[in-house]
Regions:
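Residue-level signal for pocket-adjacent positions within structured domains
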Residues: 1, 60, 66, 135-138
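Membrane-cytosol interface motif
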Residues: 1-7
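Glycine- and small-hydrophobic-enriched helix-loop-helix hairpins
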Residues: 7-113
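Bilayer-spanning, highly hydrophobic alpha-helical transmembrane segments
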Residues: 101-144
């Protein structure tokens, strides 16, 4: 579950940062270099570096990303459509929006799963403290 969460956060961060840079007028290769350095994930940094090399060699951005297998196919297809229609930044923002909502939903699920676990753990700790307090008293009463 945590791996899935980290992957979705990385995709959201990548698409949002790249979209913002493109909207600001930064050329694609330079934007990819900046995004690579801010990825915060070595696997995604490598994929972004490979994608930049592919773009430099005349490929579309979506092709090397799809080959890597690290990005979901929906992401690479939407990026491909954005490149073909000239609306790459819009598609990137839509991907970011989708993955932000996915991350929120996953965090809510994790929170709902962790609450009972924390309650049981706290019950065990309190029980242990109570037993630790009463054991000496019980042993003293058996001596008398």
């Amino acid at each position: 579950i945590f791996g899935l969460l980290l992957r979705k956060v990385a995709v959201s961060r990548f698409t949002g940062t790249l979209a913002t840079l493109i909207r600001s007028g930064v050329p694609l290769l330079q934007a990819l270099k900046i995004v690579e350095s801010t990825a915060g994930n070595e696997v995604f940094s490598r994929v972004i570096r490979d994608a930049a090399d592919g773009v430099r060699n005349g490929e579309s951005l979506a092709e090397p990303m799809a080959r890597s297998g690290e990005f979901p196919s929906m992401v690479t297809r939407m990026i491909g459509v954005g490149e073909k229609t000239g609306a790459l930044e819009i598609m990137l923002f839509k991907i970011q929006e989708f993955y932000d909502s996915e991350v929120r939903a996953l965090v809510d699920q994790l929170t709902a799963l962790l609450e009972p676990v924390v309650m049981v753990f706290m019950g065990v700790v309190v029980g242990f403290i109570i037993v630790a307090l009463f054991m000496p008293i019980m042993s003293l009463s058996s001596i008398v």
